[in-house]
Amino acid sequence: MPPRPRFDRRAPVRELPNINERIKYPKLRVVDADGTQLGIISREEALDVAQDRELDLVLVSEKADPPVCRIMNYGKFKFEQEKKAKEAKKKSHQTEVKEVKMRYKIDEHDYQVRIGQATRFLKAGDKVKCTVIFRGREIQHTNLAESLLARMAKDLEEPAEVQQAPKREGRNMIMFLTPRKTPLIKKEQELEEASKAKRTI
């Protein structure tokens, strides 16, 4: 019976950056760390210059003839690139309005489920529309719906702030929450400092 083929459990090989000794081109156009053009020099000379600066020789344009390298701190460069990529990804996120629906007579378990949903939406950077739905004569209990939404705003005060207070909209009571820009602790400290300043005057 032929042996069973073995599964290759090794992690996929990551592509290593073209820096220092990994650069194999004999001639390179080199730019110094301060932007000065060092011209076309040999690979060995470029590596010596980078080593003297205690920096890295990084291949920045492989398609050029000869390839272009820059002398830089590669660790710092990589960190800045990753930081820019994260910021770009954050800016590219388009804010959506997610809706959380409930009845004013909602039980505690279902209420906590709605709180969890709203928290996830807010942490993803989206606004949340909290809607209490009335059926038939339930419309008489708008005060209970308003109290429920006020409780929700309080329970979500850490990740959110109220953009629009509870109000009637047709047969529903709605409230809009938006992700909090100022951390709650910082905001409380600012209010406390403002209160102290008033007492001092």
Swiss-Prot record:
InterPro entries: T_IF-3_C_sf, T_IF-3_N_sf, Translation_initiation_fac3_CS, Translation_initiation_fac_3, Translation_initiation_fac_3_C, Translation_initiation_fac_3_N. GO terms for cellular component: cytosol; membrane. Pfam families: IF3_C, IF3_N. GO terms for molecular function: ribosome binding; translation initiation factor activity. The keyword S-adenosyl-L-methionine does not apply. Keywords: Cytoplasm, Initiation factor, Protein biosynthesis. GO terms for biological process: ribosome disassembly. Belongs to the IF-3 family. IF-3 binds to the 30S ribosomal subunit and shifts the equilibrium between 70S ribosomes and their 50S and 30S subunits in favor of the free subunits, thus enhancing the availability of 30S subunits on which protein synthesis initiation begins. Monomer. HAMAP family: IF_3. This is Translation initiation factor IF-3.
